[in-house]
């Protein structure tokens, strides 16, 4: 860990050079990375539809003892739905905006995720990646903020981190952030209202129909548990993308765009079947250099980044329980200009 910290401090010093601009890094990427391919885009969409269909078929025929496997598969396949919507939100799925909006709404509808709400908030994350008090994805809690909370809220947050409940984090983010159009700029509120109406209408039709035909257990079996499976991956991808003991979050006056997007974004390998079903969302460094890169070109772009900027990249990670244990045990609070602080160090200093 010490060697890694020293290396990463050297990288930070290099990237803090104000002459290094994000657009200079983007210029080194092959033009092919930005080319949209209609066949590849729709093949990915079809793959997700087939895999989700396969998942629901397995849920329908599986004996009770095989349901956990079917739930895991279906939840992961549904994450592919989100990734298709993700490309649509960045306008990298199709050249026509109306196609992106239509496909985005269709694929995020079963997840009850308002498309425009997510798109707008997610774009803010890209503009302010790893910037303290601005990034709205997985943002660390500063000690002074934690100290200002009441005992109940502090206890809830400590329980969340210590019991490693990161996997439900995106459920709270989904519920709190995406349905209240008053939290958006006036110019965006009409789009947000439309997306909220779409998912509310879908739920109003699909949920009663599902319950009427399969009962409450059918609702839990066919929608709720797979939906939680999707949120497991949503939460996991989101936290791992930008969180590690040596990855900095900077105050606005010290924030450096190239530093945040190139070094502050982490490549993590997952089981191959997860990467296929989720359309390489784990190959995340290129996506933070340019959101115009379609998901099917991420690996091509990452190979170029490794070749030209490999010395500036964070060490690659591999998804495992030990990785998630490290993140949730060490990345609990964040001291400005210092780094992450576990609760035990916070309380030891008081």
UniProtKB/Swiss-Prot annotation:
One Gene Ontology term, aspect cellular component: membrane
Catalytic activity of the protein: a 1-[(9Z)-octadecenoyl]-2-acyl-glycerolipid + 2 reduced [2Fe-2S]-[ferredoxin] + O2 + 2 H(+) = a 1-[(9Z,12Z)-octadecdienoyl]-2-acyl-glycerolipid + 2 oxidized [2Fe-2S]-[ferredoxin] + 2 H2O
InterPro entries: FA_desaturase_dom, Fatty_acid_desaturase
Subcellular location: Membrane
Domain of life: Bacteria
Motif Histidine box-2 in this chain: 122-126
Alphabetized Pfam families for the sequence: FA_desaturase
Example GO biological process: unsaturated fatty acid biosynthetic process
Topological type in the membrane: Multi-pass membrane protein
Needed co-factor(s): Fe(2+)
Keyword line: Fatty acid biosynthesis, Fatty acid metabolism, Iron, Lipid biosynthesis, Lipid metabolism, Membrane, Oxidoreductase, Transmembrane, Transmembrane helix
Family membership noted in the UniProt record: Belongs to the fatty acid desaturase type 2 family.
Official protein name in the record: sn-1 oleoyl-lipid 12-desaturase
């Amino acid at each position: 860990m010490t060697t890694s910290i020293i290396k990463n401090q050297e990288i930070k010093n290099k990237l803090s050079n104000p002459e290094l601009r994000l657009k200079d890094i983007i210029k080194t990427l092959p033009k092919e990375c930005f080319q949209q391919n209609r066949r590849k885009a729709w093949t990915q969409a079809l793959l997700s539809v087939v895999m989700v269909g396969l998942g629901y078929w397995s849920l329908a025929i599986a004996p009770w003892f095989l349901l956990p496997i079917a739930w895991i598969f279906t939840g992961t396949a549904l994450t592919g739905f989100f990734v298709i919507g993700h490309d649509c939100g960045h306008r990298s799925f199709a050249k026509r905006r109306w196609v992106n909006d239509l496909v985005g709404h269709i694929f995020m509808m079963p997840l009850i995720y308002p498309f425009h709400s997510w798109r707008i908030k997610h774009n803010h994350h890209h503009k302010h990646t790893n910037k303290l008090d601005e990034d709205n994805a997985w943002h660390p809690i500063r000690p002074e903020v934690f100290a200002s909370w009441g005992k109940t809220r502090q206890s809830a947050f400590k329980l969340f981190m210590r019991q490693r409940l990161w996997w439900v984090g995106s459920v709270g983010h989904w519920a709190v952030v995406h349905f209240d159009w008053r939290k958006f700029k006036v110019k965006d509120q009409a789009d947000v209202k439309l997306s909220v109406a779409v998912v509310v209408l879908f739920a109003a039709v699909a949920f009663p129909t599902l319950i009427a035909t399969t009962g409450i257990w059918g609702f839990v079996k066919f929608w709720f548990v797979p939906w939680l499976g999707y949120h497991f991956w949503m939460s996991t991808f989101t936290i791992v993308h930008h969180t590690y003991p040596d990855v900095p979050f900077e105050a606005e006056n010290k924030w450096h765009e190239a530093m945040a997007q190139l070094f502050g974004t982490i490549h993590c390998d997952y089981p191959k079947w997860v990467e296929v079903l989720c359309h390489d969302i784990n190959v995340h460094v290129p996506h933070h250099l340019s959101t115009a890169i379609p998901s099917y070109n991420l690996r091509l772009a990452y190979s170029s980044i490794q070749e030209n900027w490999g010395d500036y990249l964070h060490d690659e990670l591999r998804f495992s329980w030990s990785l998630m244990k490290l993140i949730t045990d060490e990345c609990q609070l964040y001291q400005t200009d210092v780094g992450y602080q576990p609760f035990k160090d916070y309380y030891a200093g008081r």
